[in-house]
Design a protein with these regions (language model features):
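N-lobe entry segment of adenylate-forming
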Residues: 1-58, 62-77, 81, 149, ...
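Conserved AMP-binding/adenylate-forming
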Residues: 53-58, 70-116, 128, 137, ...
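Conserved AMP-binding A3 loop
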Residues: 59-61, 212-236
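Conserved structural elements of the adenylate-forming
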Residues: 64-69, 199, 208, 227-249, ...
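Structural core segment of the AMP-binding/adenylate-forming
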Residues: 77, 104-191
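Conserved pre-ATP/AMP-binding loop-to-beta segment of ANL
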Residues: 180-216, 223, 246-253
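Conserved AMP-binding/adenylation subdomain of ANL enzymes
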Residues: 235-253, 261-302, 312, 316
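Gly/Ser/Thr-rich phosphate-binding loop
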Residues: 301-305, 314-375
Length: 375
């Protein structure tokens, strides 16, 4: 007779473990911050490229130095352990430094979609009671309005040109002149960094309960919610991908086309590849028509995107008859993909010498992770 006392549930039996490498079963979690995990994993690779932004390359040594400078600048601006800094931006090197710098000093980033209205941004600032706001210059006016009647004391302004190679930066500023009228509490990013030159870069002691970021759900089951994710969320994800060592190897390239304000974009598009020693090519605002050209230029082994990215790839005439055997793991999430569209993409990949089909992830912001199913 079967009773509840002698039933072995799947969660206890864990039959899926037979497919796992024994070396990774019950592997202990890294007891360190997300920043320290990246640093430890690349301590012997400091001269290798960590980030690439429109042709400008930043080594892992550059990444560490710039993160520490940003941490010092936060301290000089009055940021303390437990504070939440709101960031309204697309993905840029500065946003990446800000994430790891805030994590280093025990603060938290609240990442907000720059397409939101002033009222929407205001709501997210109020939700976490930010005193410091970081925003792109192209959305400054909206953020200035959003910061009214909040506790925001200082606004740090980024330009997409801040990390561009000099010729591109000059060209960008000529074609996109900054016509904002800045309030007295606004400070440009480079001056913000300069203000921190005498402040401490030391990290706070590791706290396993510290939330390094607030991201927002997609609102699938109701209004979008702010979700606090810890260092453990990010490090666990990176460690899981490290177990997939047949596909992910140090020195490979991941092309980041996802925004920072969703867990998928930051966990899979930034922290995971950096923790695994990959180069992250930052594409802050992807033009779908240029996807094929970008793939041929950078030859990224890895990419995390949404289904429409891969449908665009399969239809791109620039990729016709091209050898794409460099592709190792292209994954789709964030939206549904029909059976027909998936077949079209997989047929395209197979016809272009790609060994593996499209990986589909079924994710959940609250756990900063996803499941994938193979038939």
């Amino acid at each position: 007779m079967t009773t509840t006392s002698n039933v072995l549930y799947a969660s206890q039996a864990r039959p899926w473990l037979k497919y796992y490498d024994p070396n990774y079963i019950d592997q202990p979690m890294p007891e360190c911050s997300a920043f320290d995990f990246v640093r430890q994993q690349n301590k012997n690779r400091l001269s290798e490229t960590a980030l690439e932004y429109y042709g400008r390359k930043f080594t892992y040594a550059d990444f560490i130095v710039n993160t520490k400078k940003t941490a010092a600048a936060f301290r000089a601006a009055g940021v303390q352990k437990g504070d939440i800094i709101t960031v309204v931006s697309v993905m840029t090197p500065e946003v990446i430094y800000a994430f790891y710098a805030a994590d280093r000093i025990g603060a938290t980033l609240n990442l907000v979609d720059p397409r939101y209205s002033a009222d929407g941004i205001h709501e997210y600032i109020e939700e976490v009671d930010s005193h410091l706001l970081i925003c792109l210059n192209v959305v400054y006016d909206r953020c200035r309005q959003a910061a009214r009647r909040t506790h925001v004391e200082r606004v740090i302004v980024l330009s997409p040109a801040d990390s561009l190679p000099l010729p591109l930066a000059i060209g960008y500023k000529i074609s996109n002149p900054d016509r904002n009228k800045y309030d007295s509490n606004a400070l440009m990013w480079k001056q913000f960094i300069a203000n921190g030159q005498d402040a401490s870069t030391a990290g706070e002691p590791y706290d396993p309960d510290h939330a390094c970021v607030v991201v927002h759900t997609g609102g699938t089951t109701g209004s979008p919610k702010g979700v606090m994710l810890t260092d453990r969320n990010f490090n666990a994800l990176a460690q899981q991908f490290a177990a997939w060592h047949a596909l992910f190897r140090k020195g490979q390239t991941l092309m980041n086309v996802m925004p920072p304000f969703i867990a998928y974009g930051y966990a899979c598009g930034v922290h995971m590849p950096l923790a695994l020693g990959l180069k992250v090519v930052i594409i802050p605002n992807l033009d779908p028509a240029k996807l094929g050209s970008l793939l041929l230029k950078h030859k990224p082994e890895h990419m995390f995107g949404v289904p429409s990215h891969y449908q665009q790839m399969a239809a791109d005439p620039k990729l016709k008859n091209k050898d794409l055997s460099f592709i190792r793991n292209y994954a789709a999430g964030g939206d549904a993909i029909s059976i027909g569209a998936e077949k079209t993409v997989n047929d395209f990949l197979a016809a272009h010498n790609v060994e593996y089909p499209l990986a589909k992830g079924y994710g959940m912001t609250e756990v900063s992770s996803a499941a994938t199913i193979a038939a």
